[in-house]
Every structure is written in structure tokens, then in C-alpha cells.
Amino acid sequence: MPANPLCNTHRLFQLMILKKISILNFKNIREASLELSPNLNCFLGHNGEGKTNLLDAVYYLSFCRSAFNPIDSQIITHDQDFFVIDGIYENEDHDPISIYCGMKRGTKKHFKRDKKEYKRLSQHIGLIPLIFVSPADQTLIAGGSEERRRLMDVVISQYDNGYIEALNSYNKALQQRNALLKMDDEPDSALLDIWEQEMARHGEHIFQARQEFVERLIPVFQNIYRHVSDGHEEVSLRYVSHAQRGDLLDVIQRDRFKDRAVGYSLH
């Protein structure tokens, strides 16, 4: 039997098994309750019966959001006022863990672990590791770099607790800088300095995390590809970033004039 190409790779996640899921008013699933196998689960049905929405509910329990629609109010069944997803998991020590998510229209959603509500949703990310595979994943190769960055963000955020915080802070600073760059009048250079410093500070964390992720991924990717190609071909990956051009703050500030000309940051 061929060797498993994933053997002997360093594990970053604890195994979590979904034992049971209950769904109420989630997209076209009005009510459902399923007990699941710890091995392979297959769902059969006609188009439009809710197979993908069931998988999206599982995704929601891991990432606090839908894989397809970022607007939570739109995932509530059209003639209902709320949705609820309940999941019962089992960790490697066979301890049960309950995850609850619910939201009413016009209010914020509530996420709870063992009946205790999270203060911040980012505290939940990484508890239940999950990879969502779909036909749209072809864009990782055929699409632009944004899709590949998104994949890195999804994976890294599940094992690096500070990554989401850095990513959110970077994006906030980026939006503020872009707003200044789009102004008709000359933007306040002192304000630009502030937001560029924020971008550099959080961007360094993001760059280092992505660089380390790619370095971890390369031997796994090569091992799998070698297994698939029977050793006839070799492949590799390389992460290219603006941060590799030098000190990130210097890079951002050097590009200020160019970014001002196009009206947004190119980083």
C-alpha cells in the first residue's frame, strides 16, 4: 500500500468530531436534526433540497459566518424572524462540547460554547478546525492572488490566535488610508503617517504568519504531488509580498505618491 502523503506532518489542530447538528430556519432548511458518523457522512438529494446549505451550517459553526453570504440576515429562512444552529462535538479526549449560534432579524448574533457566550467571535475561531472544499476552489489556481490570500487567512486564523486581530486591524487602517488617498484635496500627511504605521505594525504579523504557513505547506504539498505523479514531477510554492521589498513602513511610505495617483493602496 502506498505511504500516506500526509504522514509525519506536524499537527497544528486538535481533532473535533461533529456528533450531532440541529438546524432551524437556516436558508431553506426549516428544521433538521442529524446524528453523524465519526467517519464518512454522505448526503444525497435532488437539487435545491438543502445539501449545500447543510454543509454551510457546519461551516457556520466553525467560522461564525456563512461560506457563501456575509450578510447574516439573508440566511434566515425568508418568512421567519430567526435562525438557530446547534452542534455537539467530541474532542480527542472524548469530552463533549456544545456550540450554539442564533440570531433574530435586526439584532446581533449570539455564539455560545457550552452555554457560555463569547465576548468576541474571534475567540471561537480555531476551536473547530475545518476545511471547506467546493468546485469554486479552482479559482485558487485560475483566479487572482486574492483567492490564495483568503485561503491562507482561513487556515492561519484557525491556529494563530492573533492573526484575525492583526488582519482586522490592518484592514481598518487600510480603509482609512484609502479614504484619505481618495480625497480631492491634499490629504493630511500626519493622518497618513498614523494609518501607515498601523498598516506596517499589523502587516508584519500577517506577513510572518503567511511566510511560515507557506514554509510548512511546501513539504506537504510536494509530498502529495509526488504521490499523485508517481514521482515523475517536482513542484514548489513561493510566497511573494510587498514586505519582502524591505522595511514595510518604508515600502508603504515610498509608494504613497503612486497610491495617491490611483486613489487606493496597492498593498
What do these predicted regions represent?
Residues 4, 10-17, 93-95, 104-106:
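C-terminal lobe/lid and adjacent interdomain/linker elements of RecA-like ASCE P-loop ATPase modules
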Residues 6-46, 72, 79, 186-267:
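Conserved NTPase motor "head" modules and their coupling/switch loops across ABC/AAA+ ATPases, GTPases
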Residues 37-74, 159:
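Phosphate-binding glycine-rich loops of NTP-binding sites
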Residues 39, 57, 127-129, 151:
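ABC transporter nucleotide-binding domains
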Residues 61, 154, 158, 173, ...:
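Conserved, well-folded catalytic cores of nucleic-acid-processing
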Residues 63-147, 156-159, 163, 218-223, ...:
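Nucleotide-state sensing region of NTPase/ATPase domains
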Residues 139-141, 146-193, 197:
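Long, charged N-terminal accessory/stalk domains
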